[in-house]
Amino acid sequence: MSMISAFGLSKYNVGQDVPLKRLPPSDRRRVLVVGQVEDDASIVMGCAARYTNNDIVRITQKENPDAEVIYRPHPDVLGGHRKEFSNPRDVANICTILSGDYDLGSLLDSVDHVYTITSLLGFEALIRRKKVTVFGAPFYSGWGLTDDRQPTPRRTAKPSLDELFAAAYILYPRYCVGSLGSSAEIEHAIMSLALEKNGVPRELAEGVSSALPAEAINVDCVSQTLEGLKSIPS
């Protein structure tokens, strides 16, 4: 997790950094609403209630009246590649709308709290130790690590963040790097992405520890969580 955060990696690993000066000057908390494609399968199949992005923005503003609400619409919707169900302009009076091509890791580092329906960015926010509110049932909700608005009674394990990360990012997937798709450990995959994104200074690469402390891992809890992840429909 420390490598992912230190190297600024995220879901897409593209876009420009989000310096705070690009956001309105403020000493208030910043709460990010992650816009999604509203007819995406992750929402249709992963959320019992039907929320639009604008619904989430309004809920966020109501629950955080003293905070600065920042809304990032999904880039595929902004680009006209996917259908728009709710118009960001309808909530422009209660939030700051980011429509540029911003780097997601930099954006997460710039906020204190993230609201989402099912986006993977919610888990990336957890990795960066941000508070996360979830309205659907993505793989990382229901374990006691997020503010959940949808019950997930089958998820009975209570893993730590380290344990959930181990289950979801180390034990569950297989990693391939290079044009030949060579099998790799997660550390090699992270370094490959970091180098591909913008190069990694040697001193930073050598100064970041990739290992999870052994005392932070409960093997039984990780195994139970991993079984829970395997049962989630893809």
Locations of regions flagged by a protein language model:
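Short loop/turn segments at strand-loop or loop-helix junctions that form parts
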Residues: 28-40, 73-74, 137
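Mid-to-C-terminal functional-domain signal that highlights helix-capping/loop sites
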Residues: 41-56
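A donor-sugar binding/catalytic signature common to diverse glycosyltransferases
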Residues: 101-146
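Leloir-type glycosyltransferase catalytic cores
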Residues: 1-26, 144-234
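Functional cation/ligand-contacting sites centered on basic and imidazole/sulfhydryl donors
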Residues: 35, 67-73, 217-220
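C-terminal structured domains
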Residues: 53-58, 84-87, 93, 103-113, ...
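Catalytic donor nucleotide-activated moiety binding site of glycosyltransferases and closely related
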Residues: 57-100
